[in-house]
Amino acid sequence: MYRHFFKRVLDILFGLIGLVVLIPVFIVVAPIIFFTDRGPVLYKSKRIGRNGKLYTMYKFRSMYVDSPDIRLEDGSTYNGEDDPRVTPIGRFLRKTSIDEFPQFINVLIGNMSLIGPRPDPPDWLDRYPDDIKVFLTAKPGITGYSQAYYRNSVDSTEKMKNDAYYATHISFPLDVKIFFKTIACVLSHENVYRDTSGDEKAREEADKLRAKENAKTIMILGASILQLPAIKKALEDGLNVVAVDMNPDAIGFKEDGVIKEVVSTIDIPKVIEVAKKHKIDGVMTLASDMPMRTVAAVSKELGLVGIDEDTAVKATDKACMRDALKAAGVPIPLYYRVKNKDEFTDAVDKIKSAGCKVIVKPADNSGSRGVNLLSDDSDPSVAYDYAAEYSRDGEILVEEFMDGAEVSVETIAVNGEVNVLQITDKITTGAPYFVETGHTQPSRLDAATKEEIKRVAIAANKAIGIKSGPSHTEIKVTKGGPKIVELGARLGGDCITTHLVPLSTGIDMVECCIKIALGESPDITVKCDRGSAIRYFEQEAGVIEKIDGLDDAEESDGVKQVSVVHGVGEEVTEIVNSASRVGFVIADGATADEAATNAENAAKKVKVVIWKDKNA
C-alpha cells in the first residue's frame, strides 16, 4: 500500500513544500548562475526513469557552458574536488545540494520521487547487470539509500547494488531513515566529492581542463583554409581558440578543441558580442582583408592590441590607401577613383593621354578579384562591369599599369618599428587578370634594389599607420623605382607567410602574430638562410576527371607539401583569380634558385585532366 499509494501522496506533499522553498532560492541563485558565464540557469538532461523510460531531469547548472564530459574508468561521471568544469557558485550549490532543488518539479510531474535510486544517463541502460536491474522498478529519487549513506564515496557498481537493495525493500520506515540521514549528510558536507586519485585518465583530462582554464583565449576571425595555420598553432600553444566563420562546415571548425562560433566575420556587433562572451585576450585574422575592420573594432571595444579603425579602412580600401600613400609621398601609380561609367571613361582617357596602359580593379576587394588590364582593342565597359561585379560599395580604381618585376614584402611591426623579414619574388599569369601562380624567397633582385624596396615598404606601413602586427606589401619595381601596388595589414596569403617565410628564415610569422595579438613579444630572430618556393598547377577550364602525378610530386627533391584545392568532379575555370587555382606544390632548397627549380619540377609532374565531354 505504501509503495503504490502513500509514497506518491508524500511526494506530492513534499513536492509542493519544495516548490515553495525553490521560488526564493531561484530568485537568489539564478542571477548568480547566469552572470557567471551568461549561460542557462537550469541544467536539463535525459535520465533513466522507472522501467527504463527516459525523462528530462532538472538541476541548477553548476558547470561552465560547453564543459566536456569526463568519465571515470567505471563509466561514472568525474566528480573530483578540484573539477575545473565547476563554477564558483556551482561548488557551493553542490556542497549544499541546492543544485538538486529543481528536481521538486520532477517530483510533482511524477517522473521522480523524493526518495529513490539516483538516476543515470541514457547510455547506462545497457550496462546494468540483470541481477541489478530490479532497481528500475522504482522511481528515481532526489535522494536515495546510496546517496544518503555513501553519497559520492562508492563506485558505480556499489551504488547499483545499494539501489537494488532499496528497490526490493521500499517501506515507510526505510524512507524516514533515508530522509533524516540525507539531512545529516548534507549538513556534515561528507563525501561531497569522490576520491579520483586512482583514476589516471580522468585526472589527466581534469589537468588538461585546468590548464585550459588558466590559458589565454584568442579569437581568430575566419576558419577557412587561410586561417587554419593560426588555429592549429594556437591550439598547439595550449591557448583557448574561438574561431568565427559564417560557414558551419569551415575546415577550421573540425580541429579538436576549437570553440565554434558561426557568425559572419564582417558582422561587427555580433563578433564583439562573441568576444565579450568568451572574455578573449586577443583577436586576429590571417591572410584575409575582409575581417580586418572587425579586428580593429573588437580591439578598440575590448582594449586589446591591434590596428586602429582608421588604419583598417586604409588597409582594406585601395582608394583610401592610395590617398594616404600619396599624401605621405610614398611612390604609387597614377590613379583615379570612380563611381560610374562616365567618371570611368574620363579616367581611362586621362591615363591613356599620359602614355600609360590602364588597369581596372575594385577598390574594396582582394585576391585578384575583378582586376583587368585594358588592351588596345578591348571594350572598356567590359572591364568596368567586371570590376563592379566584385566591388561591395561600387567604387572602382582606374590606375596606371606598372611594368616591372613584382615582389611582396613581409613585415612585422613591434612597438612602432617596422621589421622587414623577407622579400618575395612573384610570378603572375599576366594580362588580363594578373593572378599569382608562384612565389620564391628570398628575392633574387640585386642588393641595392632590395634596400630601396625595403625603404618604400616601411614608408608605406607608416603612412597607413601600422604600428603593431604584420603587413603584406606588394610592390612593382618600375624604371622609376619601386612603387606600391597595395598593402594588407595582415599576413600574406598563398602560403607566403605561413610556409615560405619559416622555410627560408626560420621565423614563424603565425606564432609572431598570435604573440602580438595577446600583447606578448614575438621572436623575429632569423634562424636560417635558405630558399623556398610555391608553384601552382597548370590547368584548363572544365570538369576535373582526375589529377595525375601527385605521388610523384610529393617524392620530388625538396618538396614539403602538395595540396589540392579543387578535386575530381569539380568544375573549374582557367585561372582568373586566386580562388580558381586547383592546387600547388611547396618546396625548399639551399638557395632561392634551387627551391624554385624543385617546386617547378614537382608541379610539372602534376596533370589536371579535364573531361572532354562532362556528360559522357
Residue ranges with predicted function:
Residues 451-473, 479, 488-547:
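Active-site "cap" helix and flanking loop/linker of ATP-utilizing ligase/carboxylase catalytic domains
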